[in-house]
């Protein structure tokens, strides 16, 4: 039985070594999460085995080899009851029993323990990690290992040479200062030119105003000559003879001969144009003018004859008309001839 167990232990150890060797060879490749977890579980189990070996060495001195054999048997039987995922944790007591048997043999056990110590450079844990916390620790160790590996690969030492820093802002400040100085000079020159132009314009305006005042100063006499002269002589107005309208005859109509004689006697020396309606009056006047005049007695006799032929109403009317005959005054009112 002891030989078979040793053979089994060696086979498992060889498998574990091959797995570890393959894992180390594949470190350069990107490990998958399943392979990383398996490798971390193996490392934890190996660390636990080393701790168990040290503890069993101290106990193996006092115990006999028969007691080790009796302790190995129930652990071998317990192998069948343990589920497959926890095979690594079940193999721990089995390996411890095989190591105790090898302690009885002597040199073989020391050589195997030395090889294990040489393979594992990590410090020995004094406390066993519980199974329910193992997965969290594996994740933490995987993250730390991956971060350390990437940091080691990415870190490359560079040689830096001490050089004084050169800032572009200093050159910009100098250029800006020069620009502002030039701008201020231009502004000052423009202001000075503006002032000179204003002064020149004022002087020109003053000269123009003085010249205008000289030209506008008139030397006038105190009293003009036309005030001393008298008014011009007035020309006499020409007075034209005024015509007056003839009043209508409202009495009975006379015969043609009577009207002609009456009008001729009343108005002497008048133009016959005023009596246009009497055509025979002008002819009679011509005849009378052609006949030589007799003394006043003949004219009086004619007047008497004419008065006898006219009624009294006609006489009143003739007197009224004779009152309006004559020259008109300044206001156009007729003056009665005396």
UniProtKB/Swiss-Prot annotation:
InterPro entries: TPX2_C, WVD2/WDL1-4. Pfam families: TPX2. Residues 1-150, 222-338 are annotated as: Disordered. One of its GO terms (molecular function) is microtubule binding. GO terms for biological process: microtubule cytoskeleton organization. It is found in: Cytoplasm, Cytoskeleton. Residues 100-115 have a biased composition (Low complexity). Residues 15-37, 59-69, 288-300 have a biased composition (Polar residues). Residues 1-14, 128-138 have a biased composition (Basic and acidic residues). Residues 177-214 form a coiled coil. Expressed in seedlings. One of its GO terms (cellular component) is microtubule. Keywords: Coiled coil, Cytoplasm, Cytoskeleton, Microtubule. Microtubule-associated protein (MAP) that regulates the orientation of interphase cortical microtubules. Belongs to the TPX2 family. This is Protein WVD2-like 2. The gene is WDL2.
